[in-house]
């Protein structure tokens, strides 16, 4: 019954793995609910900042703020690449990286260079492994990242845009659609689109003018930064919700696969045990007949 003992050892090993994946599935389910709530709570702030900024930009067209410049010749682009810090979340990071690398290659074919800010260790490791130009990064952000952890890398990129060292900035992340579906997204963060500050932007539900201190332009310049930061944080929240959803689904699949493997191993064990018993009975019968 040496074979039977080996099968039992495999069954116990798979059962232990199944317990781990089941626990990870439950943890991911809990974390996903929390990240979804954080994502929902961040939206009203971002929307209010966008609305006030849009109103100010439309009433102060000669603002001269570099972050609001809309037409530039593209010579160098920046990317804010958001991925997870941990794995075991299916093809989430692979799909985002595939979309990101395709865009990088497209720019390189046009002779346009890139500068990358990585938020999340998986994206950072991928970029470093293929020799991309990473200018700043933030990793080990945890389950509840603080905006202060992102300010350094983001400020670096925004300042380079203000100095005309970068002409366009893309935001790349995994967007949360629902529990079963997450999609890689790439958005133009800078220059800010017409749908945010142009004539096509939603109009505020009022017609009166505020008095701004110290000046409307100073407030506008401040709000532009806050708006950009809120968009990035919203994308990070989306990515974290996507990560937990993808990990929950992946761990459920792993748990189910472990259950199927255990059933198959038990079937093999029972068959081998049945064969061994049949052999022993045959030997006993043969021995009795010989006597």
Swiss-Prot record:
Keywords: ATP synthesis, Cell inner membrane, Cell membrane, CF(1), Hydrogen ion transport, Ion transport, Membrane, Transport. SUPFAM superfamilies: ATP synthase (F1-ATPase), gamma subunit. The keyword Membrane applies. GO terms for biological process: proton motive force-driven plasma membrane ATP synthesis. It is a peripheral membrane protein. One of its GO terms (molecular function) is ATP binding. Belongs to the ATPase gamma chain family. F-type ATPases have 2 components, CF(1) - the catalytic core - and CF(0) - the membrane proton channel. CF(1) has five subunits: alpha(3), beta(3), gamma(1), delta(1), epsilon(1). CF(0) has three main subunits: a, b and c. Produces ATP from ADP in the presence of a proton gradient across the membrane. The gamma chain is believed to be important in regulating ATPase activity and the flow of protons through the CF(0) complex. HAMAP family: ATP_synth_gamma_bact. This is ATP synthase gamma chain.
């Amino acid at each position: 019954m040496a074979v039977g003992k080996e099968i039992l050892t495999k069954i116990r090993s798979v059962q232990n793995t199944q317990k781990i994946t089941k626990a990870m599935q439950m943890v991911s389910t809990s974390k996903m609910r929390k990240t979804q709530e954080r994502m929902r709570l961040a939206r009203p702030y971002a929307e209010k900042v966008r609305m006030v900024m849009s109103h100010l930009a439309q009433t102060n067209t000669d603002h001269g703020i570099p972050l609001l410049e809309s037409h530039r010749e593209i010579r160098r682009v920046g990317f804010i690449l958001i991925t997870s810090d941990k794995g075991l979340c299916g093809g989430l990071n692979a799909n985002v990286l595939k979309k990101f690398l395709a865009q990088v290659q497209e720019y390189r074919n046009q002779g346009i260079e890139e500068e990358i800010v990585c938020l999340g260790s998986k994206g950072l490791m991928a970029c470093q492994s293929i020799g991309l130009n990473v200018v700043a990064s933030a990793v080990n952000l945890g389950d509840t990242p603080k905006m202060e952890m992102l300010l350094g890398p983001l400020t670096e990129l925004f300042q380079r845009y203000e100095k005309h060292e970068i002409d366009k900035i893309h935001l790349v992340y995994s967007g949360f659609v629902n529990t079963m579906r997450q999609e890689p997204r790439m958005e133009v963060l800078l220059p800010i689109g017409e749908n945010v500050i142009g004539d096509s932007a939603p109009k505020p539900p009022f017609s009166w003018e505020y008095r701004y201190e110290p000046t409307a332009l100073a407030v506008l310049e401040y709000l532009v930064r806050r708006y950009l930061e809120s968009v990035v944080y919203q994308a990070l929240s989306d990515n974290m919700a996507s990560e937990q959803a993808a990990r929950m689904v992946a761990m459920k699949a792993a748990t189910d696969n472990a259950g199927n493997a255990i059933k198959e191993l038990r079937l093999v064990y029972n068959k081998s045990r049945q064969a061994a018993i049949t052999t022993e009975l045959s030997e006993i019968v043969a021995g009795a007949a010989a006597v």
